């Protein structure tokens, strides 16, 4: 099976097309008339001097030819009267002082619309899947204003994911912003892939996936999985449902700091056309990290923990654009890496304020072998309200949380004195909590290759019914092992019968 090209390979493949690139740069020069020259290159930051009166605006895209490849620079600062400091969207190797740079007269603009479905683009909207050019003339600037308050929709509706722990304890809002928080290796990407599998496939509308500073291998795997599962057709075409925008780990910080905006711009276009869009981002932390990398090169004084002083502004400008309007909705699922498992780190802490639901993945739960390793006490959602989810759902979820909280409070006593020292009531609560913990695990479709167990999608009614029975003591007679890695409560009962038969 042919592998999707990495942006670097595609750049190398494009070298023969040098004359075409140079010609496009000339047309830009003719359009705006402003031509500058490179005066200094420091890593991803390039200084360009212009003639007096021709200074480009902040966030304008500048173009130059770097050994046959189109290199886009984005204006970040004005230095004095006729010089600008820019951030490069690709490698600056090979750039020389005195080289001509053309002002395009506007921000970076990327292709949008149905023609992007089934294709992989990079930060500047160039296709990187070796399937030919994008057949669309519709373009949209990656820097946009957030929708006005009067245009925003306030309707509250649940997005059912088929994942028990999410649907019961921290349900997602349709048209809301969802954050998946976790340290390294606790399952953020697997969970986001499962959500793509469960939600994007069942969802009739379009999806946009932005790969921000993550592994190229994972992006490649996702591309091929989407083709194999029928979500996309190779090279786009009729029937494709998802657009992919990648700026992976090997890209310079300029690309990683802007690729989330490119993906969001594609999603905004679908929303404004009246679609309900799913927007997946893996990983928002890399967006912040890339901003931090270029911030120091731009000469800004670092803030707390070495982050850029503009951290909250950068995050706010992007997150405020991800919203549901009266035309259509964007439901956003964002994986957020938590450095050293510290949720108080400025990068994840800044994200919390913008989210409707937070799913916190915990290393202590992953260590028990319970996957998805969602922390049932740390995860929150504004949707968990009896007015939205209904009285029964609300009551069951709160009972589950109080049982787990009680078990957590008793763990020190159990560790020191043992289970025998607990009261009968506490013993029952601990036994139920341990069953609930195991019943919150679930085999995933995307993890079938690792676990060998077929994936399970559980309806919300079945989830509520199962946990209601557990907290009310209806399944106290079943062994703990019966609840591990099953879907509905009926499967747990069946598993208990099998275990009893094997033991007999």
UniProtKB/Swiss-Prot annotation:
Produces ATP from ADP in the presence of a proton gradient across the membrane. The catalytic sites are hosted primarily by the beta subunits. Its EC number is 7.1.2.2. This is ATP synthase subunit beta. One of its GO terms (cellular component) is plasma membrane. Belongs to the ATPase alpha/beta chains family. It is an enzyme of class 7 (translocase). CDD domains: ATP-synt_F1_beta_C, ATP-synt_F1_beta_N, F1-ATPase_beta_CD. It is found in: Cell inner membrane. InterPro entries: AAA+_ATPase, ATP-synt_VA_C, ATP_synth_F1_bsu, ATPase_a/bsu_AS, ATPase_alpha/beta_chains, ATPase_F1/V1/A1_a/bsu_N, ATPase_F1/V1/A1_a/bsu_N_sf, ATPase_F1/V1/A1_a/bsu_nucl-bd. The gene is atpD. Residues 1-23 are annotated as: Disordered. It comes from the Bacteria. It comes from Rhizobium meliloti (strain 1021). GO terms for molecular function: ATP binding; ATP hydrolysis activity; proton-transporting ATP synthase activity, rotational mechanism. Keywords: ATP synthesis, ATP-binding, Cell inner membrane, Cell membrane, CF(1), Hydrogen ion transport, Ion transport, Membrane, Nucleotide-binding, Translocase, Transport. ATP binds at residues 182-189. It is a peripheral membrane protein. F-type ATPases have 2 components, CF(1) - the catalytic core - and CF(0) - the membrane proton channel. CF(1) has five subunits: alpha(3), beta(3), gamma(1), delta(1), epsilon(1). CF(0) has three main subunits: a(1), b(2) and c(9-12). The alpha and beta chains form an alternating ring which encloses part of the gamma chain. CF(1) is attached to CF(0) by a central stalk formed by the gamma and epsilon chains, while a peripheral stalk is formed by the delta and b chains.
């Amino acid at each position: 099976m042919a592998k999707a090209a990495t942006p670097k390979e595609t750049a190398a493949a494009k070298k023969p097309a040098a004359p075409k690139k140079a010609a496009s740069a000339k047309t830009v020069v003719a359009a705006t008339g402003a031509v500058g020259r490179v005066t200094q290159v420091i890593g991803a930051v390039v200084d360009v001097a212009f003639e007096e009166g021709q200074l480009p605006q902040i966030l304008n895209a500048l173009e130059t030819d770097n050994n046959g490849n189109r290199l886009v620079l984005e204006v970040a600062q004005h230095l004095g009267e006729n010089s600008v400091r820019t951030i490069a969207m690709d490698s600056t190797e090979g750039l020389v002082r005195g080289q001509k740079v053309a002002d395009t007269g506007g921000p970076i603009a990327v292709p949008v619309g149905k023609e992007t479905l089934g294709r992989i683009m990079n930060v500047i909207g160039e296709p990187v899947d070796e399937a030919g050019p994008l057949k669309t003339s519709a373009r949209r600037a990656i820097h946009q204003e957030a929708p006005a308050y009067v245009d925003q929709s306030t309707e509250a509706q649940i997005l059912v994911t088929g994942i028990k722990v999410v649907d019961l304890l921290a349900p997602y809002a349709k048209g809301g912003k969802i954050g998946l928080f976790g340290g390294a290796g606790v399952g953020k990407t697997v969970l986001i892939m499962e959500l793509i599998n469960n939600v994007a496939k069942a969802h009739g509308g379009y999806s946009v996936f932005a790969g921000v500073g993550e592994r190229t291998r994972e992006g490649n795997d996702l591309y091929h999985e989407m083709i194999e599962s029928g979500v996309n057709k190779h090279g786009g075409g009729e029937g494709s449902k998802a657009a992919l925008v990648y700026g992976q780990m090997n890209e310079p910080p300029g690309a990683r700091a802007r690729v989330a905006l490119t993906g969001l711009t594609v999603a905004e276009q679908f929303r404004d056309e009246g679609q309900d869009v799913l927007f997946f981002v893996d990983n928002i932390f890399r967006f912040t990290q890339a901003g931090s990398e270029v911030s120091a090169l731009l000469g800004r004084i670092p803030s707390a923990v070495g982050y850029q002083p503009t951290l909250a502004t950068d995050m706010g400008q992007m997150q405020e654009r991800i919203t549901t309007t009266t035309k259509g909705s964007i439901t956003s699922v964002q994986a957020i890496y938590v450095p050293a498992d510290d949720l108080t780190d400025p990068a994840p802490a800044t994200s919390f304020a913008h989210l409707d639901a937070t799913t916190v993945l915990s290393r202590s739960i992953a260590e028990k072998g319970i996957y998805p390793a969602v922390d049932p006490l740390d995860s929150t959602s504004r949707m968990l309200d009896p007015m939205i989810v209904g009285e029964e759902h609300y009551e069951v979820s709160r009972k589950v949380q109080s049982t787990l909280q009680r078990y957590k409070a008793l763990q020190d006593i159990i560790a020191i004195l043992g289970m025998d020292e607990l009261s009968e009531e506490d013993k029952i609560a601990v036994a139920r909590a341990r069953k609930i913990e195991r019943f919150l695990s679930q085999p995933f479709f995307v993890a079938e290759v690792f676990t060998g167990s077929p994936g399970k999608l559980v309806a919300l009614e079945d989830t509520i019914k199962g946990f209601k029975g557990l907290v009310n003591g209806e399944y106290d007679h079943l062994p703990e092992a019966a609840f591990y890695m099953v879907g509905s409560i009926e499967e747990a009962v069946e598993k208990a019968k099998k275990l009893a038969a094997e033991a007999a």
